[in-house]
Every structure is written in C-alpha cells, then in structure tokens.
C-alpha cells in the first residue's frame, strides 16, 4: 500500500532534516532551502488496529516553506492522505503560521489527519523563549477545532533523531483510522 504524505511548514523549521532523519541519512548542518518540493520513499511495516501488520510505502513530499512557492503548492497536495505540519519551537512565527498551513492543507487535500510537530527540542535550555509542550498541544487542539480534522502533537529533534519514527507511526495510525478496509486494499 502506498501512502502519500506531505511535510509542510515555514522555511527553516526542519522539514527536510526530519525526512532525512527518518530515512537514516546524515544530518546537514548547513541550511539549504528546498526548491519547490522534494520527494522521498520508504517501505515499512506498521501495525493497523483492525488489520494487524501491514506493509506500506511512504511517499513523502517535502514542500518548500518559502513564500515564493505558495502558488504552485496546491497541485502537490493532490492525493495526500495526511500531513506532518512542522514548526520550530524556538520560532514563534513558525508556530503561529501552522494555522495558515493547516488551512492550505485542508483546502487542497481535504479533511485528512495531521501530526503537528514541534521540532528542534534540542534547543530547549540553549535558546531563550522556546515554546512549551503545552503550547504545542494547544495549537493542535486549535487546528483540530478550526478545521474539523484529527490532529495529534509530537515533539522532535531531527538533529538527535528524537521521536522521528514516532511522528510517522502516529500519522500512519491516524490515517488507518480514517480509511475503510476497501481503501486499504485498493
């Protein structure tokens, strides 16, 4: 089964680093903005509540967060079954912008599950004014209520590879809850 998901959020929040960490690639310390969209694949076995173990192939679309690419993004949402919506816990603007990103996702992909990710937790204690876990939970609830979609919250560190697998596993579970058995086997 192929599952298309999108990695969305402002530029510089760590979307590409999350994808690379999930694929077990080396962390890139130098920031290189994504141009348009990057694409990754990964085949894994996941546990679906009603089906047991199932093999899936993630098709991970890593969207550029730069405003310049806003006009072309809608085309890339087509067929998405879920989103990893990322903000940087040390960047309040990226946190606030998650509402805009969630709206864009729901408008273009429909009411699909979203995992809100507070990335760069390795910066807590090193950078002033980091957002808290409670802030992330509040935003997840806000997005869920505003757009009537299933939203969970996970904190990650792409640098330290903390909770990267958990974010994708949570998204898979949420997607399977929404899909019918017919959709899974088509």
Predicted regions and their residues:
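Ras-like small GTPase catalytic G-domain
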Residues: 1-8, 17-25, 41-186
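Walker A/P-loop nucleotide-binding motif
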Residues: 11
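Conserved glycine(s) of the Walker
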Residues: 14
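Post-Walker A helix-loop "phosphate-sensing" segment adjacent to the P-loop in P-loop NTPases
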Residues: 24-32
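ATP-binding glycine-rich phosphate-binding loop
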Residues: 35-36
